[in-house]
Every structure is written in C-alpha cells, then in structure tokens.
Amino acid sequence: LAGGVVQINLLVGRQVGSFFDGAIAWLNYADRLYQLPLGVVGIAIGIVLLPDLSRRLKNGDTGGSRHALSRAMEFALFLTVPAAVALVVIPVPLIAVLFERGQFLPSDTLPTAQVLAIYGLGLPAFVLQKVLQPLYFAREDTRTPFRFAVHSMVVNAALAIGLAPLIGFSAAAWGTTFSGWAMTAQLWWGTRTMGEAARADDRLRRRLPRTVLPAAIMGLCLWALTWLMADMLGREHVRI
C-alpha cells in the first residue's frame, strides 16, 4: 500500500471525477503524460536504490548510504523539476499536439491541460517518495510508510470530496497533488531518527539551486515561445 499510494489516490480522484461529465477522460489523458516521468525516473530509481541501501546499511556503511541517497535525490530532481515546470507552463500545447483529434475535441483540451498542470505541481513529490521509501524498506520498516500512506489517502479523500462542490472536477487533481506532498513531507520528517545515513550531503544542497534556477528560466522561455508560436501550435500539421 505504501508503495502504491499514488495509484490509490488517482483511483479516488477518478471516483470523484465520475460525478462530472467528461472528467474521467480528462483525468486519464493527463495521467498518461505525468506518469511518463514518474515511471521512467521515480520507479527506476526506487528499484535500484533499495538493494544498494540495504547492502550498505547491513555493512554499516553510513557514509555510503548517505552518498547513495543524496545522488538519487540529486538525479531525481535534476530530471523531474524541469519536467514539472514544462507540465505546468505548457500543458495546453502538450495536450493539443498529442491528443486533439477524433473524439478528443478542442473543448476537451483546456480541462485536460488544467488537470495536467495540477499534476505537474505534484510531480517532484511523487518522485521523491520513490527515493525516500527505500530508506524505510532497507531497514525492514514497512509499518511507518504504511501509516504515512493512510494519512495521505485521508488528505486526498478529504480534499477531493470537500473541494468538488466548490471547484468541480479539478478537486480530484488537487487532492492527488496535495496528498503527494503530504506523503513526501511525512517520509522526510520520519528520516530524522535515522541518523547521518538519511541526511542530504553538502553536494546536494549546493546543486539544488542549480537545478531549480535553470528550470525556472526554461519555464519562462517555454512560456514566451508558446505565446509567440500560438498560431503554429494550433495548426493541424503539427499534431502527432
């Protein structure tokens, strides 16, 4: 359950979305795009990191465990922060170019893009979960992530159901995103008792601004290009 909390939260979101016409399709199409970086980066890192951490912790290699965790976080953020910025800044062109054809009408593009942008805000959190969870699993602690997952699902359900009457179908996406950050925050807070092996090293702290700042500049450039190329992006021949 702890490892699949993202998928469970998405399922809850779809149940909430089922009360709104077309919302299930919009949620599904947006999910296709945001699951790509999550699957390629987050899940892959988690699979590689768990046995490495387990081996290092078993051998008492605290420094090596810290290095492995910090490099995993560094690599994850290096790839997912720019991806998240792109999903937030240019969701409309992405959806229009990839999906706008056949039964997917121009009127479907905007709500799908809205959901995609909201999911994009939570993408770093979803990926960081895959990096932080191995810290617990490597110590054979499955109860703590399970407890955090339950808390996260409560947050998701409360927000999705509570906000739906106020903001409509997008409440499902907001619930998923906020619950993702809630899960990540709990996992990070729980590592305080794990000692030096679970702390970010100086290299990660130095490189984090170098990841965020270029991603922000990229976002500004994408926004400007989208505005300049608005007519071209709307033409039929650029759709895949």
Feature annotation, model-predicted:
Residues 1-240:
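Membrane-embedded alpha-helical bundles of multi-pass transporters/translocases
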